[in-house]
């Protein structure tokens, strides 16, 4: 076993000394790596009893198989290490015991080597005893140092508490420490005490109050000192009085604090009751009021429960916290009525009354608007056609080839008449709605009379225009008095009839001639 350990340790040191580029090239370093891994596996085997392998098998195995063996050892080893770390975190004192065991194991290994080299076992036992005695002395020293550190920490905490109580009163100009020093100096001057030695007295008192027996002795000594101070004494006694304080003569305002480790809960309660007995009723009331104020301030400053924070979202409250609370929701929709016997009976009565009255209130369907226009009814002529079949085909082809010359239908004539009436209406509306005259629209078929161009102008020269040559009767001729039908003479009736005929002929001449409808039927 010693040879395996030595060879594995040497291989491990060799791997540490090799440079990284050497691993890339094929060399004998793979054998060193395998022996080093075997060495580490054997070292970790005692700490991992759950490992299924006693040793690392590397002969005839490739790198992946070796890594799998190491992985099977490392997984339970990590769990055991975590458990050990947790155990040490709970009990830190076990780390020292573990260190002692490690020292003993190392000493035993050294003893074995010394036995192999020829040393006596008695010498080794003496050395072990010396080491144990040194360890015990070192432990005692460490414990004393720890106790001193704890005492210093407690003193610092007491000073911090005092400073924290006075923070609300102090400011830039007023400080309580300076006030206390000033008062102590005044008291020292009154009683002839040296004020410079007060720090030494405070340290001495703290040392004397560490144990109960020492406290009693110190109280006796202080009483003697007080008696000597009033009675007078030698120079040595005056030096002792120089270290005295005001609290030594008249008693302190606050009780001395003892170690919390040495006091039980009953003793702490007794000390608090003693301190409260010395306080007046006004001071006790102030203490109670101060404690209530502190509790209320703490309640206001501490984060409130999520149920007391008003409107809150799911992201701001703990997970699944709403399952334990009865929440009130505000619904916008009207809740469904609870179905009871009264509700069902009223519904049945309502249905029966509607059936008797035949008042079913069926939903009326909305009328559908026509999506397509009505088809035009074709005009059918039952009369026999006078044209031949060839003429009919010719007329249809001519209509398809020249749609402009297609014969007008009755609907086309109606459309044309409607457009003419609308134009006349628009002309009259334009004349009524404008301050100036609106000219007539351009006539489609315009006749060009044989007249000089200057005479056709709207504003013609005086020499050319005929306005100056016309008589007033020609410019404006009155129609005369309007006569009733019974007042007309025979000549008036003839004249009126001639005017009507003249107008009718003029209108018929301007209108296009109407084509006669073809009443003939087509030949089959």
Curated annotation (Swiss-Prot):
Residues 109-168, 181-191, 210-238 have a biased composition (Acidic residues). Residues 100-243, 259-283, 479-524 are annotated as: Disordered. It holds the Pfam family Mpp10. Disulfide bonds: none annotated. Belongs to the MPP10 family. Residues 169-180, 271-283, 480-493, 505-517 have a biased composition (Basic and acidic residues). A motif (Nuclear localization signal 2) lies at residues 373-380. Residues 131-165, 257-302 form a coiled coil. The keyword Ribonucleoprotein applies. Involved in nucleolar processing of pre-18S ribosomal RNA. GO terms for molecular function: mRNA binding. The keyword S-adenosyl-L-methionine does not apply. One of its GO terms (cellular component) is Mpp10 complex. A motif (Nuclear localization signal 1) lies at residues 85-92. Its main location: nucleus. Residues 196-207, 494-504 have a biased composition (Basic residues). Keywords: Coiled coil, Nucleus, Ribonucleoprotein, Ribosome biogenesis, rRNA processing. One of its GO terms (biological process) is rRNA processing. Component of the ribosomal small subunit (SSU) processome. Interacts with THAL in the nucleus. Induction: By salt stress. It is found in: Nucleus; Nucleus, Nucleolus. This is M phase phosphoprotein 10.
């Amino acid at each position: 076993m010693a040879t395996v350990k030595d060879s594995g340790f040497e291989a491990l040191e060799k791997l540490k000394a090799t440079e990284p580029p050497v691993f890339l090239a094929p060399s004998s370093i793979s054998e060193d790596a395998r022996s080093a891994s075997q060495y580490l596996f054997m070292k970790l085997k005692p700490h991992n009893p759950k490992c299924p392998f006693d040793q690392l098998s590397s002969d005839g195995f490739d790198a992946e198989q070796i890594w799998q063996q190491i992985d099977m050892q490392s997984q339970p080893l990590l769990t055991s290490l975590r458990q050990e770390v947790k155990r040490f975190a709970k009990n830190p004192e076990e780390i020292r015991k573990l260190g002692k065991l490690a020292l003993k194991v190392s000493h035993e290994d050294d003893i074995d080597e010394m036995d192999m080299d020829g040393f006596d076992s008695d010498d080794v036992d003496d050395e072990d005893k010396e080491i144990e005695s040194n360890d015990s002395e070192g432990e005692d020293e460490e414990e004393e140092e720890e106790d001193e550190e704890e005492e210093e920490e407690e003193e610092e905490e007491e000073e911090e508490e005092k400073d924290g109580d006075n923070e609300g009163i102090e400011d830039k100009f007023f400080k309580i420490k300076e006030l206390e020093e000033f008062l102590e100096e005044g008291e020292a001057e009154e009683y002839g005490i040296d004020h410079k030695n007060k720090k030494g007295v405070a340290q001495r008192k703290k040392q004397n109050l560490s144990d109960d027996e020492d406290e009693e002795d110190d109280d006796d000594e202080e009483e003697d000192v007080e008696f000597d101070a009033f009675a007078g004494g030698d120079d040595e006694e005056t030096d002792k009085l120089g270290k005295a304080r005001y609290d030594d003569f008249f008693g302190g305002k606050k009780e001395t604090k003892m170690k919390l480790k040495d006091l039980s809960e009953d003793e702490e309660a007794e000390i608090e009751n003693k301190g409260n007995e010395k306080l007046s009723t006004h001071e006790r009331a102030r203490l109670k009021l101060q404690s209530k104020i502190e509790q209320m301030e703490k309640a206001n400053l501490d984060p409130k429960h999520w149920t007391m924070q008003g409107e809150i979202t799911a992201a701001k409250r703990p997970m699944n916290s709403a399952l334990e609370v009865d929440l009130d929701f505000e619904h916008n929709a009207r809740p469904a009525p609870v179905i009871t016997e009264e509700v069902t009976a009223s519904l049945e009565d309502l249905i029966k009354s509607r059936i008797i009255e035949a008042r079913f209130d069926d939903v009326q369907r909305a009328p559908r608007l026509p999506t397509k226009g009505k088809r035009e009814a074709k005009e059918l002529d039952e009369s026999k056609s006078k044209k031949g079949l060839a003429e009919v085909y010719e007329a249809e082809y001519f209509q398809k080839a020249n749609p402009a010359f297609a014969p007008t239908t009755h609907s086309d004539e109606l459309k044309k008449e409607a457009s003419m009436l609308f134009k006349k209406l628009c002309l009259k509306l334009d004349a009524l709605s404008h301050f100036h005259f609106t000219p007539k629209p351009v006539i489609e078929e315009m006749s060009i009379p044989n007249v000089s161009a200057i005479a056709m102008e709207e504003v013609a020269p005086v020499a050319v225009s005929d306005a100056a040559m016309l008589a007033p009767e020609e410019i404006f001729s009155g129609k005369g008095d309007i006569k009733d039908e019974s007042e007309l003479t025979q000549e008036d009736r003839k004249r009126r009839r001639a005017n009507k005929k003249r107008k009718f002929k003029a209108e018929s001449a301007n209108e296009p001639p109407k084509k006669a409808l073809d009443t003939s039927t087509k030949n089959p």
